[in-house]
UniProtKB/Swiss-Prot annotation:
Source organism: Homo sapiens
Lineage of producing organism: Eukaryota, Metazoa, Chordata, Craniata, Vertebrata
One Gene Ontology cellular component annotation held by this UniProt entry: SAGA complex
Name of the protein described by the UniProt record: Proteasomal ATPase-associated factor 1
Keywords: Acetylation, Host-virus interaction, Proteasome, Repeat, WD repeat
Subunit structure: Interacts with PSMC1, PSMC2, PSMC3, PSMC4, PSMC5 and PSMC6. Interacts with SUPT6H. (Microbial infection) Interacts with HIV-1 Tat.
Spans of repeat WD: 82-121, 125-163, 167-205, 209-259, 270-308, 313-349, 353-389
SMART domains in the record: WD40 (SM00320)
Length: 392
């Protein structure tokens, strides 16, 4: 992958005034970094600044919310996107997780201020406060219906909430350590949780009961993903007949991102190991790109792309900085990744440039969610940022 380009986090404000400047840099692996600047030469009648770049950099295109820059010497090209809107009043401290409902109307987020809130996705207006976890909430997500929320906390509890009246309808107990991530199986009759206690569990929402321990790996499970398996993949057979309360687990894979540098893939119904991959550092997050391709991100900044059919060697390893990879999300023909140094970027196969979501100034971007052409991020600086993409 080409050398990463970086830009001043508030470039859009800085270049809005005459002679305003913003710094730029290019970081080719194993070579000295290149540094430069952008300068505003004036504002056009359409409100778009006229911007020139210092030697070694080229401005390909600019509008109010985006600027496309190249560094020809390193064959690097990035389109930087400024937030369309920023929501600063949802939380008062670092926001650890967020999700957007399937119809795009609502957002849910959790914060180190001790709260979990539901808000209007269009303007950040507060709708509901979800109270009931003891200690911090680590993860929250909407069910496919968009009317119900699943959350996991440091109190080792998993809870299901009504987004309409903020009532907690189900509490799952059984984990012995904080819950770090969750996944929803199919339409949501079953859910999966991953915990610091080293186990992943399958739950029956209707009866609020544990259907079984899917894996017990003796190491904290930081991230989990469920995906439909390509029919060429052997998922193994269950040792005992699955419960009739298990719904939608067949032909599904379960991916576990583990603290002990291991990425584990299982048949969700069979509980049988499909592969175990050892990475360079603790795995923080993982996602499926297709029925056989997956991504997983590590604490030392590596993004591994693996093929389940031949998982011994990665298809590719993307490394843009040594900052921890904190979230990965599949999008059309590619993926979005966020890291602990504030970078958040989109790689799409059909584009010869990387799209960078700017605004966070070296603060970790913990989670990314999308709805149609909109991307939402949450950050340690306590802000939710919404970006508008022309094509996603």
């Amino acid at each position: 992958m080409a050398a990463p380009l970086r830009i001043q986090s508030d470039w859009a404000q800085a270049l809005r005034k005459d002679e305003g400047e913003a710094w730029l840099s290019c970081h080719p692996p194993g070579k000295p970094s290149l540094y430069g600047s952008l300068t505003c030469q004036g504002i056009g009648l359409d409100g778009i600044p006229e911007v020139t770049a210092s030697e070694g950099f080229t401005v390909n295109e600019i509008n109010k919310k985006s600027i496309h820059i190249s560094c020809p010497k390193e064959n690097a090209s990035s389109k930087f996107l400024a937030p369309y809107t920023t929501f600063s009043r949802i939380h008062t401290k670092s926001i650890t997780c967020l999700d957007i409902s399937s119809r795009g109307g609502l957002g849910v987020s959790s914060s180190t201020d001790g709260t979990m809130k539901i808000w209007q996705a269009s303007n950040g207006e507060l709708r509901r406060v979800l109270e009931g976890h003891v200690f911090d909430v680590n993860c929250c997500r909407f069910f496919p219906s968009g009317l119900v929320v699943l959350s996991g906390g440091m109190d080792a509890q998993l809870k299901i909430w009504s987004a309409e009246d903020a009532s907690c309808v189900v509490t799952f107990k059984g984990h012995k350590g904080g819950i770090l991530d969750t996944a929803i199986v199919d339409r949501g009759r079953n859910v999966v949780s991953a915990s610091r206690d080293g186990t992943a569990r399958l739950w029956d929402c209707g009866r609020s009961a544990c259907l079984g321990v899917l894996a017990d790996c003796g190491s904290s499970i930081n991230g989990v993903a469920v995906g439909a398996a390509d029919n060429s993949i052997n998922l193994g057979s269950p040792e005992q007949m699955p419960s009739e309360r298990e719904v939608g687990t067949e032909a599904k894979m379960l991916l576990l991102a583990r603290e002990d540098k291991k990425l584990q893939c299982l048949g969700l119904q069979s509980r049988q190991l499909v592969f175990l991959f050892i990475g360079s550092d603790a795995f923080n997050c993982c996602t499926f790109l297709s029925g056989f391709l997956l991504l997983a991100g590590t604490q030392d900044g590596n993004i591994y792309q693996l093929d389940v059919r031949s998982p011994r060697a990665p298809v590719q390893v993307i490394h843009r900085s040594g900052a921890p990879v904190l979230s990965l999300l599949s999008v059309r023909d590619g993926f979005i990744a966020s890291q602990g140094d504030g970078s958040c970027f989109i790689v799409q196969q059909d584009l010869d440039y990387v799209t960078e979501l700017t605004g966070a100034d070296c603060d970790p971007v913990y989670k990314v969610a999308t709805w149609e052409k909109q991307i939402y991020t949450c950050c340690r600086d306590g802000l939710v940022r919404r970006y508008q993409l022309s094509d996603l």
